[in-house]
C-alpha cells in the first residue's frame, strides 16, 4: 500500500464491479488507472505523412506515427508536440483531434492528433530504427505496430477531424 506499506489484496467492493486492490491495513483502494498516450499524424508540405520504425518493444521493427506517453501534469496537446520533436526532430502545428482509442484489457488510452510540419528536417531518435514519409498508398499496412495506428490512419484518411480541440 502506498499509504501504509501493508499488503494489498484483490476484493470485489460492490456486487457486479470488477475486483480492486485494497490494503489489508488501512483499507485504501488502489485504482490502477490507465496510461495516457498521444500520437500525431504529421503531414509534410507534400502531404506525405511521417512514420518511424520502432527500435523498442512492443512492436520492434514495425511502423507507427510519432507518439508516446503523457507525463504527469503535462497538457496532452503539449505532449503531442513534444513527442513529434523527440521522435521526428520537427516542430509541428496541431490541426485537430483525429480520435481517442482504447481497448478492453489494454492500459493505454491513445489520443491521436492531426498536424502539419512546420520544419522539414526529419531525424529519428534512439527509440526508432528509421524515419520515412509515406503517401496513403505507400503505408506499410501489414507492418504497423498497433491496432490504434491502423484505426487512426484509416480515420485520418477518411477525413475524421475534430478541429476545435487543441
Cite the ranges covered by each PLM segment.
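Active-site-adjacent beta-strand/loop module that shapes the phosphate/pyrophosphate-binding cleft
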Residues: 33, 101-123, 152, 157-160
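Conserved beta-strand segments that form the floor/walls of ligand-binding pockets within enzyme
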Residues: 22, 37, 50-51, 64, ...
